[in-house]
Amino acid sequence: MPRSVPDMSELLVKGVKHVYGRKMRKTRPTLPNVESPLVTHFHRWAGKRIRLSFLAAELGTREGQHILPDWNLRGNLFAGLLAAPMRWDRLGNLRVPKSFLMQTKARALEAPSDGKLVKIISVVEERGPGSSSYVPQSKAALQRAKQAMFVPVALQQSDMRYFSSEEIAVDKDTLLAEYSAQLISKVKEGLEVLLSMSGTSHERVELEDWDVVVTYDPDNANDIELRKCKGIPGDPVVIILNMGCLKCTELEELVNLRLRNHEYGLVLKVLKNERLLKFMYRLITFSR
């Protein structure tokens, strides 16, 4: 009777079991004790826009334990700028918080001339319908940029209405000048509101961490500084915004004389003056 050829796979399995015996047990890897919300709440992050969140639910507690430590981000100007929604930077070709970008929109000309149907304008506060284009908030960089960067992509690629480059008016110098004028107007308006609300223009305030000290010092080459104030109780870390680069006598009078409330300059609290401070930051960064 012919001998049957053994199945080599069965022999291999039996040999391995014989050699290793009880060591051939299935072992499950133990998961590390990870507290990062990127892992524990990954379903909330995956495929979504990542941004800083200051909601109480995010910074609060769960079962008596903090999900995230509180670094007083609500009172931090830079954290507030980073928390802005992300937009696509046409010039840099990457996604950036819109606090660091200048927005442009197209407006139909009431009286078209020379074949121009629409005009590209700068927008300080996002309002109204229509597609937008976002470019770096830097006057020096935008002066070297091509005019096409200011034109919303959807304006030229729309299936309903197509505009050729000859039909779109882009006056780059005028656009940048108007944007700067709008920011200066917003800053002046905010400072005038503070002046009307304050009982006395020289009411002194105490410095705390992440307060913003607004100065007007043309001799200081630093427009934005992060400074630790030694000698003051608590050694607070403050943000310095120097408006001296703007060369505006009205702002100089408001900051250095009429609204000065500390020996260092005009001290503003982020939570109370967030809108004004963001306009100041945008104006300084754009001017440089």
Swiss-Prot record:
Gene Ontology CC: mitochondrion
GO BP annotations listed: mitochondrial genome maintenance
Primary location class: mitochondrion
Alphabetical keyword list: Mitochondrion
The UniProt record lists the keyword Mitochondrion: yes
Compartment list: Mitochondrion
InterPro entries to which the protein is assigned, alphabetical: Rrg8
Role of this protein: Required for respiratory activity and maintenance and expression of the mitochondrial genome.
Family recorded in the similarity comment: Belongs to the RRG8 family.
Name of the protein this chain belongs to: Required for respiratory growth protein 8, mitochondrial
Organism in which the protein naturally occurs: Eremothecium gossypii (strain ATCC 10895 / CBS 109.51 / FGSC 9923 / NRRL Y-1056) (Yeast)
Organism lineage string: Eukaryota, Fungi, Dikarya, Ascomycota, Saccharomycotina
Gene it is expressed from: RRG8
